[in-house]
Amino acid sequence: MTARLVLASNNAKKAVEMTTLLAPLGIEVLPQSAFDIPEADEPHPTFVENALAKARHAAALSGLPAVADDSGLCVAALGGAPGVQSARFAGEPKSDARNNALLVERLAGSADRRAFFYSVVALVRHADDPRPLIADGEWHGTILYAPRGANGFGYDPLFFLPELGQTAAELDAQLKNTLSHRGAAMRHLLARLSTAPL
């Protein structure tokens, strides 16, 4: 029997990533848009609080278990910014192009280009689940001076992986899922799900 799980996101590319990662467990991922669920507020100062709030919101409005992630780019020279504000770094409406341009602008003249992506994934079996499953992952790299690559989304075109000589936006989806912060968080979550199923 296939388990159904609501993804608390309207990001189509994130939905594809999550579906690919959860399919081996026989879990059908449904986007929250299938239930006309609006995006949850993300007012919290930490990734874990935002991920949990989004998962609880989707579970409450769908009546199904829900999974959410909150991810962001943390740049050393910017004191960890954009961090939890990564999607809205350049303000509303959200725009990957404007966020990337602002990041390049803020790092102009900085020799320290170190950065990492961080992801927290939260899964709740119901809206009031007292024992949510929470997992996280990191992905380290550096920030380029100009974007490269057409795959991925967000800051992927600027996020350079020195050991591969490529940006995240130059990787194919399978390799990205193997290496990425979200992939690492999902692998940790999958390990937990194997002992504490839906």
From Swiss-Prot:
InterPro entries named among the record's database cross-references: dITP/XTP_pyrophosphatase (IPR020922), ITPase-like_fam (IPR029001), RdgB/HAM1 (IPR002637)
Entry EC number(s): 3.6.1.66
CDD domains named among the record's database cross-references: HAM1 (cd00515)
GO function terms (MF aspect): dITP diphosphatase activity; ITP diphosphatase activity; metal ion binding; nucleotide binding; ribonucleoside triphosphate phosphatase activity; XTP diphosphatase activity
Cofactor(s) required, per the database record: Mg(2+)
Keyword Magnesium found: yes
Free-text cofactor note: Binds 1 Mg(2+) ion per subunit.
Enzymatic reactions: XTP + H2O = XMP + diphosphate + H(+); dITP + H2O = dIMP + diphosphate + H(+); ITP + H2O = IMP + diphosphate + H(+)
Leading EC class: hydrolase
GO cellular component, one term: cytosol
Pfam family, one: Ham1p_like
Binding site for Mg(2+): D41, D70
Keyword Nucleotide-binding in record: yes
Assigned keywords, A-Z: Hydrolase, Magnesium, Metal-binding, Nucleotide metabolism, Nucleotide-binding
GO biological process, one term: purine nucleoside triphosphate catabolic process
Residues that, per the record, bind substrate: S9, N10, N11, A12, K13, K14, S71, F153, G154, Y155, D156, K176, H181, R182
Active-site residues from the entry: D70
Subunit structure: Homodimer.
Classification via NCBIfam families: RdgB/HAM1 family non-canonical purine NTP pyrophosphatase
Family: Belongs to the HAM1 NTPase family.
PANTHER family: INOSINE TRIPHOSPHATE PYROPHOSPHATASE, INOSINE TRIPHOSPHATE PYROPHOSPHATASE/HAM1 PROTEIN
Record function comment: Pyrophosphatase that catalyzes the hydrolysis of nucleoside triphosphates to their monophosphate derivatives, with a high preference for the non-canonical purine nucleotides XTP (xanthosine triphosphate), dITP (deoxyinosine triphosphate) and ITP. Seems to function as a house-cleaning enzyme that removes non-canonical purine nucleotides from the nucleotide pool, thus preventing their incorporation into DNA/RNA and avoiding chromosomal lesions.
Name of the protein: dITP/XTP pyrophosphatase
Source organism of this protein record: Aromatoleum aromaticum (strain DSM 19018 / LMG 30748 / EbN1) (Azoarcus sp. (strain EbN1))
